[in-house]
Every structure is written in structure tokens, then in C-alpha cells.
């Protein structure tokens, strides 16, 4: 036996440690590798480039609402009324989305307080079929505004959507006027409607309730628009300006009221609600 074998045999056996697959995350903007826990503790904002990552409904509610908030039940709807099928059945897509998400559809409502200010908050879950707006989202939106009217508080919509849910056809598009009527009822009750635009907010959602807020707030770098940039460029046959459809561009051109960093969002919302509700509280 050679001395090499003697050394190799003398080395102690150390079993390979299992490393979690999700220990690291790569920033989609600057490509820096980040510890997932540190990234999540930083509200899913990159500490190197300040890129605001997409977060789920539960994380968003935990970030915005004080402890002890109430999750509102999701209204029931008839599933797959058109018996739609593309490469797979719509009912199968719904089942797969529900298996991967904690909520039954793409909009979740909660009632609670934002730094002591009462509010009903509706958060869209982009991970649920791209946050697409269908009958379930429409019903949840209406239910959220109705609860806000009952509680005499604002309704805050946190949008993140690719648009209308094509598998529901005209029934999906009907949610655009439905949500508009719900906002009108909120206003008739003398209550504010506040929108927080997050990345991405596009399509039929942008063309309806996402742009109807009394106060329009956006997160930095959020993509906000109706049609995609390629579609617009091919239609008008012109190159679009730098940063087109981003939150900062919309703010510079008067389309939204403010761009607010995620860490400041809760305090900003509390201040806005306090200002808008001051006269009503005194009345």
C-alpha cells in the first residue's frame, strides 16, 4: 500500500451536509447573490441596488397592517362557467394555482389598522395566475369595499396583475365596470379609495380600479401600463422614451401622486388616511 492510500484511509469520513435550495436568491436587477432570509427581512428589497422584488399577499399584509388584523373570507363564485380549455383545462389551472398559494384566488382582503388607522386592505397575489382579474377577484373587490363602508374606513387596493383573466372571457371584463361601481359607492359613503401600484400592474386592472384612486401611490420601479411596450412601439412606429411605463416616469408626467419606498409605505398610508379621514372623524 502506498503512502497516498495510507493518508486517504486515515482521513475521517464527514457526511455531506444538506444545504437548502432556497438559501440564496439572485437579485433580478443587479444580479448580486443575497441570503434569502436577509432579503426577506429587508422587505424583499435588494440592499445593493434597492430593487423592489415581488412579494406575496401574506407578506404584504404583514408589512402594512398592525398585529391582529382580520382576514376576510373570499366570496364564492361559479368556477369555469365557460368550460374553457387551452393547452389544459381552466379548472386544472385553478387547482394548480391553489396548490401553490395560501389563498383561493388572486385578491385577498383584510380588515385592520395601519399604524392605528382603520382600513380594509385588498392585496393582489401576482403568483396566482399572474394576479389576473376574474369573477373571484371582482367579487372580492366588491366585498372589500362593502366592508369598508360598513366599518366607515378607507379601502386600500394593492395592485399586482397582468390584466383580465382570459379563461373567463367577457365575464372577466365585466369586473372592470363592477369595480368602478363599487368605488363610486365608496365615494357616495364619503370614504376614500387609495391605490398602491406595485410591479407589475397592467392590462384591464390598470384600465379600471388601479387608476381610480383618490390617492395614487407606487413603489419604485413598478411597471404600470395597459398594453406592452412592444405592442405600443409596433403600433405607433416610434421608439418609446427611457423608463416609459415605470413608476418614476408616470409620477414625472402627473399620472400618479407619489413614489414611495416599501419601508416607508406603511407610515405614508397612515398619514394619508389620517389626513383624508380627519374631517369625517370630527363630523
UniProtKB/Swiss-Prot annotation:
GO cellular component assignments: acetate CoA-transferase complex
High-level lineage: Bacteria, Pseudomonadati, Pseudomonadota, Alphaproteobacteria, Sphingomonadales
Residues noted as binding Zn(2+) in the record, renumbered to the chain: 27, 30, 46, 49
Record protein name field: Acetyl-coenzyme A carboxylase carboxyl transferase subunit beta
Zinc finger regions, C4-type: 27-49
Known EC number: 2.1.3.15
Reaction(s) catalysed (UniProt annotation): N(6)-carboxybiotinyl-L-lysyl-[protein] + acetyl-CoA = N(6)-biotinyl-L-lysyl-[protein] + malonyl-CoA
Function: Component of the acetyl coenzyme A carboxylase (ACC) complex. Biotin carboxylase (BC) catalyzes the carboxylation of biotin on its carrier protein (BCCP) and then the CO(2) group is transferred by the transcarboxylase to acetyl-CoA to form malonyl-CoA.
